[in-house]
């Protein structure tokens, strides 16, 4: 992106998989005080997330000099935060939201971003909704399994709408299972018994809730956690959530007796029992339990792919697809086998690799 004077057009090149490049011209004007104003038609701009990513990934080598670099960063930041249409409080919330999502484990980052929260409160509500669906030690095992199945169905239906191959769907399913268990484990650290070396021993039901393979090995997600064949290890209490003791859970599920502090959380929870899917697609009739999932599904019909790779321009309908794709460029392989140390960029490949270890173990047992 080249630097332009205030009187000239500022050209932002947005990669597009269907074209070599799509040029968005933003006419900048000069106000009476000599500062930069704008006659931008905000409705025709790409999603602010595109400009946020460009702002964060901008490099000094992308500009001819320091003055041009500052100018381009200022423009990208303006197109992200949009001070012409947002209040100071809204801009503050956008910055807080970005940092909050950034400190979450990667799987939870994907889950939150798929729901497109516009501020910190909406992001918290997304996590609280997920939290309300997770295991409750006082509930029957069958109900806990049913909850997990509902969550897995939601995320896999999102990726199925994108037309991913079965191997990628397996990866998404397992990512949600382990991210859900992670959030539950972090919340209930004090309720779990510790092993001799300080690792937390999870509930036995979690092992039976997954597929026939063993745990996903070491998952390097930037937080001190270790997923190793059914054992979870991380500093006790570090991520414990502090609740407001004055906040009472006044909403009770008539089916299972679980309490909720918000009526909206109870409504979502009750769909586990009723199987209700009130959000239907007018194009194909497929129904979903949440409106956010319907929005994701509708991209099958519209062809919308708002998540673009800044490296090659390839576009995706889901943010999780973009995250997986970017590992091709970065070479990141966060999924490591604890038995041999081999790493993979996709969790599905790790699971497939671990099945070979399991088969070898079985053969050794048979030989003995």
Swiss-Prot record:
Gene3D superfamilies: Classic Zinc Finger, DNA breaking-rejoining enzymes
InterPro entries linked: SCAN_dom, SCAN_sf, Znf_C2H2_sf, Znf_C2H2_type
Mapped zinc finger ranges (C2H2-type): 251-273, 279-301, 307-329, 335-357
Entry similarity comment: Belongs to the krueppel C2H2-type zinc-finger protein family.
Record keyword Nucleotide-binding present: no
Residues in SCAN box domain copies: 52-134
Covalent crosslink: Glycyl lysine isopeptide (Lys-Gly) (interchain with G-Cter in SUMO2): 22, 27, 147, 177, 236, 277, 286, 361, 367
PROSITE patterns xref list: SCAN_BOX (PS50804), ZINC_FINGER_C2H2_1 (PS00028), ZINC_FINGER_C2H2_2 (PS50157)
Subcellular location per the Swiss-Prot or TrEMBL entry: Nucleus
SMART domains the UniProt entry points to: SCAN (SM00431), ZnF_C2H2 (SM00355)
Protein name, as recorded: Zinc finger protein 24
Glycyl lysine isopeptide (Lys-Gly) (interchain with G-Cter in SUMO1), cross-linked positions: 27
Post-translational modification: Sumoylated.
UniProt cross-references to SUPFAM superfamilies, sorted A to Z: beta-beta-alpha zinc fingers (SSF57667), Retrovirus capsid dimerization domain-like (SSF47353)
